[in-house]
Amino acid sequence: MPIQLEIVTAERVVLSEEVDMVSAPSVEGRVGILPRHEPLLTVLQPGELHYVKNGVSMPYAISGGFMEVLPNRVTILADTAERADEIDETRAEQARLQAEQAMRDRQSTEDLARAEIALRRATVRLQVAKLRRNRQ
């Protein structure tokens, strides 16, 4: 019995598909979801979201959000979500370099926190893009 997975951002429905398993970066650690999982609501942190369908793992870069789990449905409300083939590696690398520079130039703890979040997002995007490149 598959799980209905929906990944939604403010701009669009990124994915609506039946899958075999979902793995997401919760603030409490990585969470794996299989069919008939107990209901769960959790906060997601920036990281790699994977789903498995027919034995193939598909990675997405997400920048945080929420995940609602019902026995046969998972809904991801993400700040942003990108498939590996949607990521521009050059732009992601530029964002990583800018975030590192912002961390060095910080003026306050808020600046540092923003720069750390930007660095994490850029790093995740690069990791997911690398997964795509390694599969080709």
From Swiss-Prot:
Lipid biosynthesis in keyword set:
no
| Key word Secreted present | no
Could you list this entry's UniProt keywords, alphabetically sorted. ATP synthesis, Cell membrane, CF(1), Hydrogen ion transport, Ion transport, Membrane, Transport
Location of this chain's protein in the cell: Cell membrane
A Pfam family in this protein?
ATP-synt_DE
Positions of disulphide bridges: none
GO cellular component terms, alphabetically, are:
plasma membrane; proton-transporting ATP synthase complex
Give the membrane topology, semicolon-separated if more than one. Answer: Peripheral membrane protein
User: GO molecular function of the protein, one example?
Assistant: proton-transporting ATP synthase activity, rotational mechanism
NCBIfam families per the UniProt record, alphabetical: ATP_synt_epsi, PRK13446.1, PRK14735.1
User: Which HAMAP family does its entry note?
Assistant: ATP_synth_epsil_bac
| Record note on quaternary structure | F-type ATPases have 2 components, CF(1) - the catalytic core - and CF(0) - the membrane proton channel. CF(1) has five subunits: alpha(3), beta(3), gamma(1), delta(1), epsilon(1). CF(0) has three main subunits: a, b and c.
Question: In which family does this protein belong, per the annotation?
Answer: Belongs to the ATPase epsilon chain family.
Tell me the function of this protein: Produces ATP from ADP in the presence of a proton gradient across the membrane.
Q: What name appears for this protein in its UniProt entry? A: ATP synthase epsilon chain
Question: What organism is this sequence from?
Answer: Herpetosiphon aurantiacus (strain ATCC 23779 / DSM 785 / 114-95)
